[in-house]
Amino acid sequence: MSLVERLQDSRRREGRPPQKAPRAARTSSAAPRPAVNRDLRTQLLRLDRIDSTLRSAWVATEFKDRALERKLNALTDAGIDWLRETIKVHGWPGHRLVGRSGAAAAWRLIQHADCSLAFQKHCLKLLRDAAARGDVPIQQVAYLTDVVRMREGKKQLYGTKFRKMKGELVPYPIEKEAGVDLRRKEMNLPSLAAYARKIRRTFQPS
C-alpha cells in the first residue's frame, strides 16, 4: 500500500472522508505576451511631444516662421536617425513593442519626416505587415501611403493630405477620385467629406 493509500485508509478509520489529491496546476497553451519596451516608448513619446509643440506653433504662424521650421526639421532628422536604428534591432514599433501611444508616435514621426524616400517606403512595407497581424491600425497605412505616393509625384489614393487654395483647405489631387470613399471605407476611414469638415474645423476655424 502506498503512502497516499495508507493516509486515506487512516482517515476512513477515523470517520473522516479521504483527502482529495491536489489538482495539477493548469498550464496555459497561449504564450505570454511580451512586455512593452518602456525605454523605446518613452523616447517615442518624448519626440512626439516636442514635435507637437513645435508643429502647433509653426501652424499658428501659417508656416511662415523659418526659425521654428528649422527647429522642427532638426528634431525630425534626429528622430528619424533614432527610428532607423530602432527598426534594425526591433522591427516596426507596433502595439506589442511600445504600446498604442508609442506606436502612434512612431507613425506620426515617419509621416512628418523629410527623410530618404527609400526609408519611408521601407517603413510603409513594415507598417503594412504590422497592420496585417493587428499590431497597428490599418488607417495608419492609408496616411503613409499617401505621403509616399505624393513624394513619388503620384496622386494620393485616400485623400488624407490637404493644401490651401483660394483661402480654403482642399485635398491634394486624388487618383480616381470617384472611388475614394470606397477605398477609405476599406481602410476604416470616414468619408472624404466628413474628413474635410474635420480638417477645416481644426486648421481653418471660422
Residue spans of the language-model regions?
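An amphipathic alpha-helical core segment
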Residues: 124-190
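Short, surface-exposed acidic
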Residues: 94-97, 191-197
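Charged/polar low-complexity intrinsically disordered segments
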Residues: 8, 19-20
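Intrinsically disordered, compositionally biased glycine-rich interaction modules
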Residues: 169, 196-206
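N-terminal helix-rich structural modules
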Residues: 25-153
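Short linear clamp-binding motif
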Residues: 2-11, 183
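Compositionally biased, low-complexity segments
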Residues: 6, 24-25
